[in-house]
Amino acid sequence: MRHEPVLYERRLWKLLRHRRLAGLKFRRQFVIGGYIVDFICFRHRLIVEADGPQHEDRAEDAARDEWLKAQGFRVLRFPNQQIENRGEQVITAIIAAADERLTKD
C-alpha cells in the first residue's frame, strides 16, 4: 500500500472524505481480496479508481474489475485528465452510480 496518494487521488479524496459527496461514506486505499482499491463505499458496493499511467495494462485491470464485480461491487474508473478537467462530470457519475446501486437494493 502506498503511503502517499498521488495528486489525482488526493483531489478525489478531498471530495469524498467526511461524507462530502452526497453523504456517501468512502474509505481510501482499502485492501479487498488481495487488491488495493483507491476508494470504496460499502453501503453502495461502489469502488472509485483514479487511473494514471500505471493503469496502461488494461488486461490486468479488467481481470481485477471482473473479480470485484463477482463480489458484488461496481467499479468506476476515471482517467487523471478527466478528474483534472471535468471534475463535475466525475462527481455526477459517482453520485448517479451510488443512486443506481441504492435503488437496486
Language-model features, listed with the residues they occupy:
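Basic, amphipathic alpha-helical patches used to engage nucleic acids or provide basic targeting signals
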Residues: 1-6, 30-97, 101
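Solvent-exposed, charged helical/coil patches
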Residues: 1-25, 98-105
